[in-house]
Amino acid sequence: MEESQNGVKYGGDATDAKEYFTIQPRSLQNCDLKDIERKTKFAHLQNYRTNYPEMGMCLIINNKNFHSSNMAVRNGTDVDALKLHETFTGLGYEVMVCNDQKSSDIIGRLKKISEEDHSKRSSFVCAILSHGEEDGSICGVDVPIHIKNLTDLFRGDRCKTLVGKPKIFFIQACRGTELDSGIETDSCSEPREEIQRIPVEADFLYAYSTVPGYCSWRDKMDGSWFIQSLCKMIKLYGSHLELIQILTCVNHMVALDFETFHAKKQIPCVVSMLTKSFYFFK
């Protein structure tokens, strides 16, 4: 239903919930403190390589209509998908948008991409726009699927050509049914070369539109707070800030610049297993 304020009509806000004993590491054995300090002194300055021939694939799963499951239509999601397509095309990604996907379709598309040769690509990006559940599932247009079933396809032991490269997932979906009422605040304004083994769960980043247990807001005309803020911050800062800094700006924008007519708030949640800084430019 449209809402109005001071005579101006708005598309209204909606949510994306589904209705309603240790061994000393070998690297430290026979290693003195100075050696450790030498190895780690400049670790925080290391960046992921982006000078590959291609930036990589960007898959956008845009689920709007849920006819078989009786969940609400996600009006405004097409605005998000279009903005994401524009943003990541501008960054040099090969973008694929898939609309109204069943859970089996989502798994199939991601499995196919995980089996591709990514040797000439710097990263992989996936954005999922859908309803979500409190247990961490996202919804196909038919049934839910846990996000881990999707991201596990890109683990280092399964997708060899993306080992050591960023695998970035943006999730626009509710993670529960709680509503955030907010609170007022008082405020003023060189290591030697060696072969390394990488944990299979390394180099993933998950950027969720909201924290566990809470709803995620989407304007029915303008798109979701999270995706619109993400695209805006990438446009403003993607040419000089690294990804975590950009996502911090996204958190700031969503937390402070948005509010529903009923004074409800939202804060995105970033879970990072990245091991270096990632920039969207070469």
From Swiss-Prot:
Reactions it catalyzes: Strict requirement for an Asp residue at positions P1 and P4. It has a preferred cleavage sequence of Asp-Xaa-Xaa-Asp-|- with a hydrophobic amino-acid residue at P2 and a hydrophilic amino-acid residue at P3, although Val or Ala are also accepted at this position
Pfam family, one: Peptidase_C14
EC number: 3.4.22.56
Major localization listed first in the record, in broad terms: cytoplasm
Biological process annotations from GO: apoptotic process; erythrocyte differentiation; execution phase of apoptosis; keratinocyte differentiation; neuron differentiation; positive regulation of neuron apoptotic process; proteolysis
Gene3D superfamilies found in the cross-reference section: 3.40.50.1460
EC class of the enzyme, as a word: hydrolase
Molecular functions per Gene Ontology: cysteine-type endopeptidase activity; endopeptidase activity; enzyme activator activity
GO CC field: cytoplasm; death-inducing signaling complex
Cellular compartment(s): Cytoplasm
Annotated keywords: Apoptosis, Cytoplasm, Hydrolase, Protease, Thiol protease, Zymogen
Residues at the active site: 131, 174
Miscellaneous field: The subunits are derived from the precursor sequence by a probable autocatalytic mechanism and probably by other caspases.
Subunit structure: Heterotetramer that consists of two anti-parallel arranged heterodimers, each one formed by a 17 kDa (p17) and a 12 kDa (p12) subunit.
Function: Important mediator of apoptosis. At the onset of apoptosis, it proteolytically cleaves poly(ADP-ribose) polymerase PARP1 at a '216-Asp-|-Gly-217' bond.
Family: Belongs to the peptidase C14A family.
Protein's name in the database: Caspase-3
Gene symbol of the encoding locus: casp3
